[in-house]
């Protein structure tokens, strides 16, 4: 079994929907899935409620209410204070191997890689010990250009191709973890 850690502040809703569908479909392989955000995410909350209900349903006639309440989803949503790196710090605190993370945040990816996790960004690129330094340097350089007014803050939008690339990379990584750890 393995865990998944999701920086859900920056993960687009279509991406979260894909991840949630796969987690619910193949939940038997997952120890825990952790979403960290500075706000309640209705889609994640609904997935937790739905999953908990589906786990309890077959046991309603055999267990009393107290025992049923102990049965809960292994999907967790952490609401952290709004502020710099609060969701990041929570994910780093929770992180454990074997596991992988999903984030757009390059400094967070670097911290998670140091803890032994594989990281996937929201465009479907796998970040590793081998490539994170270059990505971090590029990010820091672009940040300094933005701060000094040389470059305006523009991010490429998510088109269907980008969403498909993420979906394919997520499925491949998930399948790799199932083969390796389950």
Language-model segment annotations:
Residues 2-182:
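Nuclease catalytic cores that cleave nucleic-acid phosphodiester bonds
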């Amino acid at each position: 079994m393995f865990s998944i850690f999701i920086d859900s502040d920056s993960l687009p809703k279509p991406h979260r929907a894909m991840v949630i569908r796969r987690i619910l479909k193949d939940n038997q392989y997952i120890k825990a899935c952790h979403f960290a955000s500075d706000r309640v995410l209705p889609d994640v909350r609904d997935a937790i409620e739905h999953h908990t209900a589906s786990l309890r349903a077959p046991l309603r006639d055999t267990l009393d209410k107290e025992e049923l309440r102990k049965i809960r989803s292994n999907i967790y949503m952490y609401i952290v204070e709004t502020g710099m790196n609060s969701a990041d710090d929570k994910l780093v605190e929770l992180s454990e191997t074997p596991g992988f993370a999903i984030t757009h945040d390059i400094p967070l990816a670097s911290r998670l890689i140091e803890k032994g996790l594989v990281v996937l960004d929201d465009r479907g690129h796998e970040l590793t010990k081998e490539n994170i330094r270059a990505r971090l340097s590029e990010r820091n350089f672009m940040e300094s250009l933005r701060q000094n007014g040389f470059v305006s803050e523009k991010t490429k939008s998510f088109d269907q191709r980008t969403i498909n690339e993420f979906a394919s990379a997520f499925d491949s990584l998930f399948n790799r973890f199932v083969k390796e750890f389950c």
